[in-house]
Amino acid sequence: MKCDMHVHTIHSGMCTIPGMSRFCRESYNHPEALYESLKSQGMDLVTVTDHDSIDAVEALRSRPDFFLSEEVTCHLPGGTEIHVGVYDLNDRQHIEIQRRASDFLSLHAYLNEQELLYSANHIFSGLTGRRSAEDFRWFENAFPAIEARNGCMLERSNRAAADFTRRTGKVPIGGSDAHAMKSVGSCWTEVKDARDKQEFLAGVRLGLGEARGASGSFWKLTRDVLWIGCQMIRERPATLPMIFLSPAAPVITLVNYILEVRFVNKWTPRVLPPLCDGQLIAEPVVEEVAA
C-alpha cells in the first residue's frame, strides 16, 4: 500500500513570507480535489498534514481510505523551530497537541502517552530557520520517525535525511509536502503486503515502510510558486497588479536553492562524516540526549 504522508490544503493557513501573509495562502489545494489527485496517482490511502489544522477532515471524514494527520509547528528546548508530522490522530488529540505545541517536552510526553506515530520533517532544510547540533541529538533520541524523502526538498537534502534515518535506526517517512496541486503524490511511503490502514500504519511503525518518489528542484519550486500566485489572484482579484512581480519568482527560488544547498552542505559533514573510502558509517554519530 502507498500513501503520500505529507501534503497540504487550503487549511494550512496563510503564507509566512513577510508582506504576503495578509492575502496569500500557504496552499490552494482543496481537500476533495487533493483526494481525487492522490487516488488517480495510485495512492491506496490518503491523509492530509496541514499546518496546525485538521479542518480538511470535514470534507474527507467519510472516505474509508482516509486518516487524519497534521504538521505541528513547535520549538525544541534550544529554541529552534521544527515541523512534526503526527499521523492517524483524532479531534480530541489534535486539541491537546495544539495546547502543548509551545512546550516540546510536554508535547513529546503526550505523543508517547497516546502512542501516536510522529516524525521530524525536512531536517536537512533551512525551511524553519536556523539549526543547531543539539537539534540532531533530539532528532535521534526523541523521535521514532524521520522524514527520509520529501518531494519539495533537494535530492542532496533527502539523501542526507535518508542516511541519518538509517544510521539512527529510525522509521522512514516519505511525502510530497505538496502545497501546489502539481506536486501532489510526488513522494510517498510504501508498505508492501499491507491490506488496510491498520496494517499499513503498523508496518510503518515497524520500519517496514519505504520512502519513495522524486525530490524537489529549482524548476519544480518555481512552477509551484507561480501556480500558488495564480491561485491567489483567482481568489483575490484585487491582487492582480502583483502579476507584474511574476518574473521575480525564479530569482526568489534561485536564492532559496542556493541557501538550501549551503544549509545541507554545512550540516551533512557535521552530522554524517564519511569514512576514508567515502562510505557513510553505519552506527549513530550523535550523542544521546536525556528525555
Specify the residue positions occupied by each region the protein language model found.
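An N-terminally biased module of ancient metal coordination in phosphate/nucleic-acid-related enzymes
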Residues: M1-E81, N141, K182, R270-A291
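Domain-core and long-helix interface of multi-subunit machines
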Residues: C3-R22, D91-S186, A214-T222, T253, ...
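A short acidic, glycine/proline-enriched capping/turn motif at secondary-structure boundaries
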Residues: S53-I54, V72-H75, N90-H94, S125-G126
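Short, hinge-like loop/turn segments at secondary-structure boundaries
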Residues: P64-F66, V84-Y87, F136-F139, T189-D193
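Short, charged, surface-exposed secondary-structure boundary motifs
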Residues: H75-V84, E155-N158, S183-G185, F200-R205
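A basic- and aromatic-enriched beta-loop-alpha substructure that forms the phosphate/nucleotide-
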Residues: T80-H94
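A conserved mid-domain beta-alpha-beta active-site/ligand-binding segment of alpha/beta enzyme cores
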Residues: A194-S246
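A hydrophobic membrane-anchoring feature enriched in long, contiguous, low-charge segments
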Residues: G229, I233-N265, P269
